[in-house]
Amino acid sequence: MDLIFTSVLIGIGLAMDCLAVSFAVGAHQKTSRIRAAFILALFFGGFQGGMTLLGWLLGSGFADAIAAYDHWVAAGLLFIIGGKMVLDGIKDGHEEEAPDVFNFVAVFILAVATSIDALAVGLSFSLLHIVPLIPALIIGLISAIFSVGGVYSGGKIGHILGKRVDILGGVILTLIGIRILLEHLVWNGAGA
């Protein structure tokens, strides 16, 4: 199969987490959607492409070391952020200004959590002796595009649902974390 076509398919698969997280953030963010879309596209696209290259550079020796706990880290980060969003959504009281989800730490955590699979893809490129520069660029670009789409579609839904969208966003992030754990612990037959 052609490397570019395969890279597009891999990019779409990896971008689904970026899309879901961007949707949740877009729905939660009340203002500055252009800024939100730009920041998430930059971070998510950059991290997806960068982690693909990093995985390739580190090679197969590192895969065994990180495989034992990568899913716990990614899921834990998503559970923390998702749980905070759910709690914010169920708090009684008047509508508060949305928290600044675009501080560096929050965006960094989300970017790392959504790009750990890209690290594994890069490791597989290393094992297959594929130089991943073009695939990493394609993966990063697709993730950036999906991130922009997620912010804008989440923003449209956010206006309809109001404060309940915090709960929806938190549930989405938590479900992504659960999916990551199920993939590694159940569906792949891996142990804890």
Curated annotation (Swiss-Prot):
Keywords: Cell membrane, Ion transport, Manganese, Membrane, Transmembrane, Transmembrane helix, Transport. It comes from the Archaea. The keyword Isomerase does not apply. It holds the Pfam family Mntp. GO terms for cellular component: plasma membrane. InterPro entries: Mntp/YtaF (IPR003810), Put_MntP (IPR022929). The keyword Ligase does not apply. GO terms for molecular function: manganese ion transmembrane transporter activity. It is found in: Cell membrane. The chain crosses the membrane at residues 3-23, 38-58, 61-81, 101-121, 130-150, 167-187. It is a multi-pass membrane protein. Probably functions as a manganese efflux pump. PANTHER family: MANGANESE EFFLUX PUMP MNTP-RELATED. Belongs to the MntP (TC 9.B.29) family. This is Putative manganese efflux pump MntP. It comes from Methanospirillum hungatei JF-1 (strain ATCC 27890 / DSM 864 / NBRC 100397 / JF-1). The gene is mntP.
